[in-house]
């Protein structure tokens, strides 16, 4: 490297053409330890013990819990409770994620979807997620799935979550949800949200048909008492489609319904 001047080496290093650690040799190159009193960077009274070295933010572990919906639901003279939320623990790039959604009434769980996932950041706004999903329905057989999906913030501030599932017996499923915050004031905002579910084959034991199975669209008016505590009221339209709607009709259940909701969102 004696043929390279320091300026040439700096240009090559900046451009990524000079390997790290290779330095240009010059007759006037200064010894980096010339004025250190005989000490190097790894010794002396101000040297840090490796156990106490400075840790950057991406090396720390964090945790968060967020309950997006904890609400009272009323439709056609019936009432029940509903929840949807997620928690995570890990670093900036890799974390353990728990997702949950379900309905309950009279102190008993009626149905739930729980996911245990490993999340990995692939960009500043997107995570990939890999893990397992567990479905529970009262009086129905439980289902277990492998899950792979993406979750993140799309352009124009749309929050998206799309996950594909593979279950036993050749079962497949796809779930997609989206929501958006439309600010009315600094604290008051409307939140439209939607969710759809697709299944690859019929599952008559759980009253699920092949294809587009069910979906819902909701609109909630939220008020931020604080950033961490947000009460709301809203309305939601839920519908079943295709073979799932036929199964609901045969069982005497509603294929479509309008739901009125009131609840809170909170996180810490």
Language-model features and meaning:
Residues 93-98, 124-128, 156-160, 185-190, ...:
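Repeated loop/turn-to-beta-strand initiation elements of outer-membrane beta-barrel proteins
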Residues 219-224, 255-268:
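Outer-membrane beta-barrel "beta-signal"
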Residues 61-63, 79-83, 110-114, 142-146, ...:
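Residues that define the transmembrane beta-barrel architecture of outer-membrane proteins
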Residues 141-204:
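Detector for outer-membrane/organellar transmembrane beta-barrel domains
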Residues 85, 116, 148, 176-178, ...:
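Membrane-embedded beta-strands of outer-membrane beta-barrel proteins
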Residues 89-91, 120, 152, 166, ...:
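Residue-level signature of outer-membrane beta-barrel architecture
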Residues 25-107, 120:
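Outer-membrane beta-barrel initiation region
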Residues 69, 98-102, 130-134, 162-166, ...:
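Transmembrane beta-barrel strands of outer-membrane/channel proteins
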